[in-house]
Amino acid sequence: MSQFFDKSEVRRIALSGEPVPFCGLYFYPITVEHYGIFLACESALTVRLSMLPAVYAVQNYAQALFSMQIDAMMQNGEAGQLGYWSRMMQLLVLSLKINPETASQCIKMIVDKDNPKTLKALVITQTTSENGESFARITPQQIGQIRELIALMNGRELPDEADNVELIQAEQDVQELNRAFELDVNMEDLKASIAANQHIRMKELDQWTILEFDLIKNAIDRDKHFMVYGIGEASGMVKFKNGNPVPSPFFNKKKENV
């Protein structure tokens, strides 16, 4: 459940491709054109603070990611720049429609003069054809809220920090052990599959929002599973204790029934 936003309203706006105003800025849904970058950076949204080293886990989201990356850069040089903080900044650039080439001029990091590892604020200048120039000073606490907004606009859910960390790790270990093979996951094949199903050219997908793309992809997947399970059960080749595991081609099961 969203802590700061009306989830259904944010999703409605995101599906329309329109921006959501927040903190004096305009946040846009990320499009399929940038899906590869989004997938490479989404771990910055879904990271569990409770699974970070204790020194970072006790900090707020923005400060934890920022100080963690500063420490990594001090230890590993340029290699340390590829952390959660950099990924979050890339997602911010995409969401604000800032030109990556001018991002360093449009997003300024303000740190404590006595402790450069302490983030004080982001000073952001955003210019769009629709809304002109916007200026905002964003606090670390607001960055945590922006994290939630970007996740909602692009169909992602934030982790529940109250979940049992040891149980989560155990489940991840089991999934790793049970992985029989690795798929060659790539955007070209995924886009080709969706385009073929929708009878459109692949390049037309680039302007879709990620949220719409994923909803269509999941609908295709649900429909195929509904048919395969239904045919299998009708033929007598397989019998499901509680009926078709995917009982509808149009709707998902309620979560408590999954």
Where are these regions (language model features)?
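Long amphipathic alpha-helical segments with strong coiled-coil/leucine-zipper propensity
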Residues: 87-173
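Intrinsically disordered, low-complexity regions
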Residues: 2, 10, 89, 93, ...
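Long, intrinsically disordered, low-complexity Ser/Thr/Pro-rich regulatory/activation regions
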Residues: 233-258
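Intrinsic-disorder/low-complexity loop/linker signature
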Residues: 24, 117, 131-133, 182, ...
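An amphipathic, hydrophobic-aromatic interaction surface with interspersed Lys/Arg
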Residues: 1-82, 138-232
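Context-gated lysine
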Residues: 7, 97, 108, 113, ...
